[in-house]
Regions:
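Compositionally biased, intrinsically disordered low-complexity regions enriched in proline and serine
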Residues: 26-28, 41, 109, 180, ...
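C-terminal accessory extensions appended to soluble enzyme cores
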Residues: 223-240
Length: 240
C-alpha cells in the first residue's frame, strides 16, 4: 500500500490506472506519463509474462486498465483512510473490476475507503459497503448543474454512505449552498500543475457556508501556499 502526500488520506490504492474524461489539468495523466513504463514492468513481473501489448498500449495512452499487482497490495493493519482511485475515475471502470474491489473492501471494515468521480450517477450502479465514502469532484464552474442533479439523486440512493465534495481544482465561484445540505464533508484545493490557487474570496465563502451548515471542511496545504494567513481548517467527519 502506498503512503501518500495527499493530505486528506493516509494511503492510495489504485487497482485501476487510466481515465477517459480528458481534463486538461489532470495530475494523474502527468504522473502516468512519467511512470507508466515502471508500472508496465512491475505488472509483467507479477503476471510472470515477458510482454503484454494491450497492457503496454493502455498504460502508455492512459486508458483504463486493471492492475493485478496493485489490487493484491497488502492493506495496513492500523485503521486508515485509503483513497481508492487517485489514478482513475470509476466512471470508466468495467463492472467486474468494481465488483472485485468492493468484495475486497468488505474484508476490511476497519478501514475507510474513499472514492472520487466526476460522474456521480455511477454511485447508483453498485452497492457500496458502509465504510466507503463517496466523493464527487467539482471545479465550481458553471455548466456543472447536471452533475449536481446527478449527485442529489445518487445521494438519495446511497443514503447509508457518507458523501463529500472535492473542489479541486477550485476554478470558479459557482456556489453549492443548496447542495451542501446533502453532504458531510468538503475538500478544497488548488490546481497543482501549473499552480493556480482559487481566489481568496471563494475560500472565504466556502468557509462561511460550511460553518453555517455545520459541515466539516478540509482546506489542502496547496491553498495555504497562496494564503498563509487563512485559518487552518483540516476537519474530518465525526466517525473518523
Amino acid at each position: 500500500m502506498n503512503r501518500t502526500k495527499i493530505d486528506w488520506c493516509d494511503y492510495t490504492w489504485n487497482p485501476v490506472w487510466g481515465c477517459l474524461t480528458g481534463c486538461e489539468y489532470c495530475y494523474a495523466r502527468k504522473l502516468a506519463k512519467r511512470f507508466w513504463k515502471q508500472m508496465y514492468i512491475k505488472e509483467l513481473r507479477f503476471q510472470q509474462k515477458i510482454a503484454n501489448e494491450p497492457l503496454r498500449k493502455n498504460l502508455a495512452e492512459f486508458k483504463p486498465v486493471f492492475l493485478q499487482s496493485n489490487f493484491n497490495k497488502k492493506f495496513p493493519g492500523k485503521p486508515s483512510k485509503i483513497f481508492v482511485n487517485s489514478m482513475s475515475d470509476i466512471r470508466w471502470w468495467k463492472k467486474h473490476w468494481m465488483k472485485r474491489v468492493l468484495e475486497k473492501i468488505k474484508e476490511y471494515p476497519q478501514h475507510t475507503f474513499l472514492f472520487l468521480t466526476k460522474f456521480p450517477a455511477v454511485y447508483e450502479e453498485y452497492k457500496f459497503p458502509q465504510n466507503c465514502w463517496l466523493g464527487v469532484t467539482f471545479t465550481g464552474s458553471y455548466g456543472e448543474e447536471s452533475r449536481l442533479e446527478e449527485f442529489g439523486y445518487a445521494r438519495k440512493v446511497r443514503n447509508r454512505n457518507l458523501f463529500f465534495f472535492s473542489l479541486e481544482p477550485f476554478l470558479d465561484n459557482y456556489l453549492f449552498e443548496n447542495y451542501l445540505l446533502d453532504i458531510e464533508w468538503v475538500i478544497v484545493g488548488a490546481q497543482t500543475n501549473p499552480y493556480q490557487p482559487p481566489k481568496r474570496e471563494w475560500i472565504e465563502e466556502i468557509i462561511k457556508h460550511t460553518r453555517k451548515l455545520e459541515i466539516k471542511l478540509f482546506i489542502k496545504d496547496n491553498v495555504y501556499r497562496a494564503y498563509p494567513d487563512l485559518p487552518v481548517i483540516k476537519e474530518f467527519p465525526a466517525n473518523l
